[in-house]
Amino acid sequence: MASSTDTILKGKYPAKEHVRKVVEYIKSKEPEAEGVLYLEAQKTIMIEDNDEAAPFRQRRFFYYLTGCDLPDAYFTYDIATDKSTLFIPPIDPESVIWTGLPLSPKEALALYDVDEVLTTDTINAQLALPNQTKVWAIAPQISTHITFLEFPQKDFTLLKEAIEEARVRKSEYEVALMRKANEISKVGHTAVLKAVKHAKNERELEALFIKESIANGAREQAYHSIVASGTAAATLHYMKNSEELDGKLNLLLDAGGEYKCYASDITRTFPINGRFTPESRSIYDIVLSMQSQCISMLKAGVSWDEVHLLAHKVAIEGLLSLGILKGDKEEILKARTSVAFFPHGLGHYLGMDTHDTGGHPNYEDKDRLFRYLRVRGNLPEGSVVTVEPGIYFCRFIIEPYLKDPAHAQYINSDILEKYWEVGGVRIEDNVLITKDGYDNLTTVVKDVEEMEKIINES
């Protein structure tokens, strides 16, 4: 029996609904807004000094208003008539022998949620129709051969802002795409759990995750996977994925497949030999508590700053209980000493991009506790946010705190010495914000006993 997710995804991507959301935002800024929205797909780009095309990644602004993943396409939408038109490349007889017949306008009309499909060789003629008023476009994404001569007014800034804000609140279809991406990524994460005890190298596990992603329908990765063993897990965006596993305690796997342009972003940390050391287990339990308490706060309207603050409070209490921190918990929080162990933001919006639009971060914030928080303000219903607390033992980050009396007074360096080999622990889920609560889209195992059981029975 097909799942509700699969049933939803049998329909068309709701491009027209998205266009109307974007226009609603534009009209909130300019109530009398009229004219034409104009967007371009990503171009076919050739690899430098090569006759092969570079890997294709559709422009997210274009996809949001079309659902079309074809390169070299165009899109217009007439605000007054509510008419959307997709322009796709015409048949190139020279290319058919190599790549087969392209999508026809008739096929495209049946596939995409637009009112009309024409070929790209007609775009300038369509833009030259009389009685035009204003064109809304994105400045860096306009081809040199495109002219807007018939438009007395041009706005190359508001459309991008409008799409970025509209993307925050996900439609039912978008949520289904992200749920599907999470389902596929669960297969990959579980496969890595089953393989880790007998694997020799990080790259084996990265390859396994990618294999399972592709085999189950996620042909692209949402981002470069992080497969960090041992102390490498203290590097937030570790990229090497090539170290031997022998002699390491834990593996941090931050990996998510992308399904039809929509991302998953999942992190799990687990023991390579199938059993956490006491030190690793104690840190894992703190991080799991950080995550569970933060998730329990989530609902429409909650302040993300407050949720992030709670994560630090839970971290401080946990590190105090282990003796890594010492002193008064309120003073430690006020000093921001916990940032030494939890230096990043609690999470970010998720959607077509891993770090999705609309978060309004303030990287100039003088308060280091909030400086790297990628979402500021209150979470709206329909948004999807990652909840990814972590505790890390990174010498490069922590040692300056040990040399600063303002922080050193709160850190027990003797007890800290026992935890360097833990490296880092992060747990990350993708959570939909609902009116009265939340819906966790991520179902990858994170209970310690269950993880260890899977590792040891494989």
From Swiss-Prot:
Residues the entry annotates as binding Mn(2+) 2: 254, 265, 428
Q: What's one Pfam family the UniProt record gives for this protein?
A: AMP_N
Question: For this protein, what is the EC number?
Answer: 3.4.11.9
* Required co-factors: Mn(2+)
- Ligand binding (Mn(2+) 1): 265, 388, 428
Please name the GO terms of the biological process aspect recorded for this protein, alphabetically. Answer: proteolysis
Keyword Calcium part of the UniProt annotation? no
Quickly give the catalysed reaction.
Release of any N-terminal amino acid, including proline, that is linked to proline, even from a dipeptide or tripeptide
Cofactor info, note text: Binds 2 manganese ions per subunit.
Q: What is this protein called?
A: Probable Xaa-Pro aminopeptidase pepP
Q: Which organism is it from?
A: Botryotinia fuckeliana (strain B05.10) (Noble rot fungus)
